[in-house]
Amino acid sequence: MSGARTRLLHLSDLHVGSREEPRIEPGLAALINRIEPELIIASGDLTHRGRPEQHERAADFLRSLGRPVLAVPGNHDIPYTPIARFTRTFEHFEHQWKTTEPIYHSDQLHVVGLNSVRPWRHQSGGIRQDQLEHAANHLAEAASSALRVVVLHHHLIGAPWRSRKKPVSRRSHVLAALVDAGAELILAGHIHQAAMSERHEFEVVSREVRGTTVAIAPGLGQPRPDRRGEARGMLVYESEPSTLTVHTYIWREDDWGLTAIRRFPRGREPLAPQSTPAAEELSTSGP
């Protein structure tokens, strides 16, 4: 596998319209200038109540960050009034983003967005078979060097202390289909806490060595005081030809702090033993 390094910034659950923190925007802009991501991903719940003005503010904020943005909807991004929820489900989201299942591709990165929101479900979500086929068809078009990424709102794994939120429906089937399609990285949000794992850490897979990393971004919106363990945060992925490194950043009242680093192998080659610093800030140089 050949290819250059690239970086991807993953935000989720902005919940624009609910207790916003005005210092987030300049702090995030400064961090983006340092790490220079190729793409910003927003994995749903951009708004708190799915209102047109909230969608507009969320889109303006994300576009102001000066990088390409790929966004998928979350369960909070559709109307809460019953009639509009079923007749104009994604109208306001699509007014800003054109589609609920966007695609981004370059020589280093190939990203497929999937819409897991179902209007008849208040919290949980699902992915249909035709959506899985859609993802497989697009991932098959990726450059040989590209990191293959799938994004949806509802989680496939979750933090063990937040198990009460249901993951995406038929998650084992969804995961297996995306892995078979070649996804190396599957991103989501929804639970407002960071979680990540390589599929072999939670799933017995016989005679199969393909590595797939599943990651959940902590929410960027206001933490809810009645929910234990929530913090504002985001994830940064640094992809190189043989490795994927995930950096977790948490907002600490007035700035972003690096709190964790995990490193995963890419492709089918086993990762050679190598010492990794416990905490190492991303280089300020670009990819």
Question: For each of these PLM feature ranges, what is it?
Answer:
Residues 164-240:
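Conserved beta-sheet core of the metallophosphoesterase superfamily
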Residues 238-287:
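A short C-terminal boundary segment appended to hydrolase-like catalytic domains
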